[in-house]
């Protein structure tokens, strides 16, 4: 066992003395058992994590009963919703790297034999997953589970995005102070990751398809007693994985990655999933390129539409309708789309995991013969405005905006854009451009939920597009094109735009362009001043110096895979 490094031999007497002092070691027999890290992300700032302390307790008890010695440790987390719209959002994506590094540090410093990862929200799941693949010891993921959708007294279903959009509606006097307060008080009824197909739930669903979590991980509610049972099962499984030395790189292969992207496209997941899955692929040393995604999306039907694409369906409905397993089973009917032989932490193949699943409500999970669209709910756009690509959640774009040409309204930061939207500077037909908000320029590639929600709330969702080198919340909807690469801070073409430039977005053709010649773009860029970092001290200053493009997952410059092709 790896842990023998810190517990076997006369020379490890000091180590054993310290281990005994923790209270976790209760007898000399414990040194013969595998040391299992319970990597928890409990904190009281994130509603998706406020209940994880109890899940950690359950995991520890079950690991001990199964023959392991559990050591719980915590890592940080950021609530994207609370961090939204201020300096805090610049720390959100950057926290992913801190989480990965901190988990790696604890696991390697203490020579743990296996890990039970208990994440839930946006950057915590991918951060832990990056660390797990980096250290490559047996691991299993079991998330905290999704939040229930909220309901107003009149029976209307609401969620966090309802509140953000209500702010825009309130600014136009469409709703009263009291109506806004009613939505605010009912949208988030309890613990769990926010209730739609936002980033947290997207990543926790993808964990099943990647093979690193048990069936049900992505959809069983935080408040459902089955969630505790899932934690127990996962905690027993880690002992099996340690004994068989089944490691995450044995599971997360290229075929598992493609399975996960197929699920992502079928559910119209958050655009952030692309960012995170590319980063995870890098840690697994899989040579996967951004440009491959459109070919996969082209053969993956969009069969499960969930909030924010529709307020009629939330994650609890997906669970009731059969969950991720039912979606994967339906997709498996398409020849060659999924690799059902992919191994999983259950000890079974993906095909065996989903064999008993069924669609229980075709209004929630459609069949492949009756999809919302024949192609997936996410797409990568290319053109002279995004030579290295940009990402759009096609499943949340209204039909009228799938093709759009309009004049640019350019803003060099998110705050100015929000002000412009609220002050009616933005008119129907415009293309809002928010730049210098990329991984380096932001820094931290902040989410644009506030401006997209303001656009929707002010009734402009069917007539205004927004493009940015930043990113979007999983809750954003509308013609929102993000991750524009190269970013403005790297002198990408988006930096050359001026007010009035005509921008054409053609989502079916997967293109995004500005009506300028290459020469004109280059001439404008040559006249730009050298980019001046916005933050010059602390973690974000270091992050900005090391972070790479969104098209490589915004990973740090420590890998041979981090340069765009």
UniProtKB/Swiss-Prot annotation:
Names of the cofactor(s): [2Fe-2S] cluster; Mg(2+)
N6-carboxylysine: residues carrying this PTM: 123
Signal peptide: none
GO molecular function, one term: dihydroxy-acid dehydratase activity
GO CC terms of this entry: cytosol
Protein name: Dihydroxy-acid dehydratase
Class of the enzyme per the UniProt entry, highest EC level: lyase
Binding site for [2Fe-2S] cluster: 121, 194
Entry superkingdom: Bacteria
């Amino acid at each position: 066992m790896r842990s023998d490094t810190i517990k076997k031999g006369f020379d490890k007497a000091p180590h054993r003395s310290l281990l005994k002092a923790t209270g976790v070691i209760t007898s000399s027999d414990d040194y013969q058992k595998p040391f299992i890290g319970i990597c928890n992300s409990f904190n009281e700032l994130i509603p998706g994590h406020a209940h994880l302390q109890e899940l950690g307790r359950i995991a520890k008890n079950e690991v001990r009963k199964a023959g392991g010695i559990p050591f719980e440790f915590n890592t940080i987390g950021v609530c994207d919703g609370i961090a939204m719209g201020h300096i805090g959002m610049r720390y959100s994506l950057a926290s992913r790297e801190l989480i990965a590094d901190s988990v790696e540090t604890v696991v390697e410093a203490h020579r743990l034999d296996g890990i039970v990862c208990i994440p839930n929200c946006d950057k915590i799941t991918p951060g832990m997953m990056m660390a797990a693949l980096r250290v490559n010891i047996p691991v299993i993921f079991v998330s905290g589970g999704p939040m229930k959708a909220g309901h107003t007294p009149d029976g209307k279903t609401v969620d966090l995005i309802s509140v953000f959009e209500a702010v825009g509606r309130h600014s136009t006097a469409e709703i009263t102070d009291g109506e806004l307060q009613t939505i605010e008080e009912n949208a988030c009824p309890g613990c769990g990751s926010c209730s739609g197909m936002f980033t947290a739930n997207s990543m926790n669903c993808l964990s099943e398809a990647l093979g690193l979590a048990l069936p049900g991980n992505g959809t069983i509610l935080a408040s459902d007693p089955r969630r505790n049972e899932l934690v127990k099962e996962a905690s027993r499984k880690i002992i099996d994985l340690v004994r068989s030395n089944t490691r995450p790189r044995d599971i997360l292969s290229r075929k598992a990655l493609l399975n996960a992207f197929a699920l992502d496209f079928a559910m119209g997941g958050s655009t952030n999933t692309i960012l995170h899955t590319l980063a995870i692929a890098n840690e697994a040393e899989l040579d996967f390129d951004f440009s491959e995604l459109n070919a996969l999306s082209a053969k993956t039907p969009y069969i499960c539409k969930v909030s924010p694409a529709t307020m009629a369906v939330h994650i609890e409905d997906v669970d009731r309708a059969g969950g991720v397993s039912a979606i994967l089973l339906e997709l498996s009917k398409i020849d060659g789309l999924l690799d059902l032989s992919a191994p999983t932490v259950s000890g079974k193949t993906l095909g065996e995991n989903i064999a008993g699943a069924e669609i229980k409500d075709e209004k929630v999970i459609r069949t492949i013969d009756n999809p919302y669209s024949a192609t997936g709910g996410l797409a990568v756009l290319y053109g002279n405005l995004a030579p290295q690509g940009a990402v759009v959640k096609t499943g949340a774009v209204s039909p009228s905006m799938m093709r759009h040409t309009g004049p640019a309204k350019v803003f060099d930061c998110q705050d100015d854009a929000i002000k412009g939207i609220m002050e009616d500077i933005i008119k129907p037909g415009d293309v809002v451009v928010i730049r210098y908000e990329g991984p380096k320029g932001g820094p931290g590639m902040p989410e644009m939920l506030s401006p997209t929600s303001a656009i929707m709330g002010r009734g402009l969702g069917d007539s205004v597009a927004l493009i940015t080198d930043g990113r979007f919340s999983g809750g954003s909807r509308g013609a929102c094109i993000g991750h524009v690469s190269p970013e403005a801070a790297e002198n990408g073409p988006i930096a050359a735009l001026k007010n009035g430039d005509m921008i054409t977005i053609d989502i079916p053709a997967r293109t995004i362009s500005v009506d300028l010649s290459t020469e004109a773009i280059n001439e404008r860029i040559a006249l730009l001043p050298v980019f001046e970092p916005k933050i010059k001290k602390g973690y974000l200053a270091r992050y900005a110096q090391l972070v790479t493009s969104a098209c490589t997952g915004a990973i740090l410059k420590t890998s041979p895979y981090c340069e765009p092709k």
